[in-house]
């Protein structure tokens, strides 16, 4: 039997939980979260491995369970379906409200599948979110490791890359030395926890490095770092203008690389409570012109904890 969900009702309760998160477990039960995962999984499975979308659209980077900052993004830009969104992954781990964050986003995906797009980040992989907070949160708040496992089943169906207006290639991490054509991205297998090595693992993990030419091993211990020459070569070969990725904290929320052929977007201000970085989102208008909105970290006097 296909799972069904009253998505409006669930969204309303998630939006009313507030920033403390204290009311989540009393207002949303585990079975509802499992159903939300199941329905979201079917939506991801119905769409392509390379999401080919048209502007206008807002592109957002890492969120990392910073629920109040996710809501700031919607408050500033508008809510779907009036505004289209593409998120570049890393919804969970490190922040304090991972479950609210990922479930609200799944609700938007279910309700507005053609207006709200979510790529997978490296933190939507079990080896990572088992360690960096999401597993612990599922266990602490719902006393359930099964809930955590069901989230992994949904994450395994999430797409790894997107293409805006045929000109802006999007992924969480970076490029791959094995990437030669867009058709390779269209044919990426799902469901899958991408193996190492693979194009998939590079899309999740790779980083640009201004001191490197070509490809070198990544100090993260997985995938590669790549130079400006690689970005120029890939843009030429794939006939694209820009690569948009996330995966790294940048002080102003966005940072260009390779003569503006690549941009890093990071959308979690005051990341981990340890950095004083701003966040940013990138708006791509109907004419493929990109502009950035910055979100300053909340003043220290207003922060909790």
Curated annotation (Swiss-Prot):
Keywords: Cell projection, Chromosome, Cytoplasm, Differentiation, Hydrolase, Manganese, Metal-binding, Protein phosphatase, Spermatogenesis. Mn(2+) 2 binds at residues 90, 122, 172, 247. One of its GO terms (molecular function) is metal ion binding. It catalyses: O-phospho-L-seryl-[protein] + H2O = L-seryl-[protein] + phosphate; O-phospho-L-threonyl-[protein] + H2O = L-threonyl-[protein] + phosphate. InterPro entries: Calcineurin-like_PHP_ApaH (IPR004843), Metallo-depent_PP-like (IPR029052), PP1_catalytic_subunit (IPR050341), Ser/Thr-sp_prot-phosphatase (IPR006186), STPPase_N (IPR031675). Its EC number is 3.1.3.16. GO terms for cellular component: chromatin; cytoplasm; nucleus; pseudopodium. The active site is at 123 (proton donor). Mn(2+) 1 binds at residues 62, 64, 90. The keyword Disulfide bond does not apply. Transmembrane segments: none annotated. Expressed in male germline including spermatocytes, spermatids and spermatozoa. Disruption phenotype: No obvious phenotype. Simultaneous RNAi-mediated knockdown of gsp-3 and gsp-4 results in male sterility due to chromosome segregation defects during sperm meiosis. gsp-3 and gsp-4 double mutant hermaphrodites have egg laying defects and no viable progeny. gsp-3, gsp-4 and him-8 triple mutants have incomplete separation of sister chromatids during the second meiotic segregation. Mislocalization of MSP in activated sperm. In addition, have partial reduction in mpk-1 phosphorylation and air-2 association with bivalent chromosomes in the most proximal oocyte in response to MSP. Probable phosphatase which plays a redundant role with gsp-4 in spermatogenesis by regulating sister chromatid segregation during meiosis. In addition, involved in sperm motility by controlling the dynamic disassembly of major sperm proteins (MSP) in the spermatozoan pseudopodium. Belongs to the PPP phosphatase family. This is Serine/threonine-protein phosphatase PP1-delta. It comes from Caenorhabditis elegans.
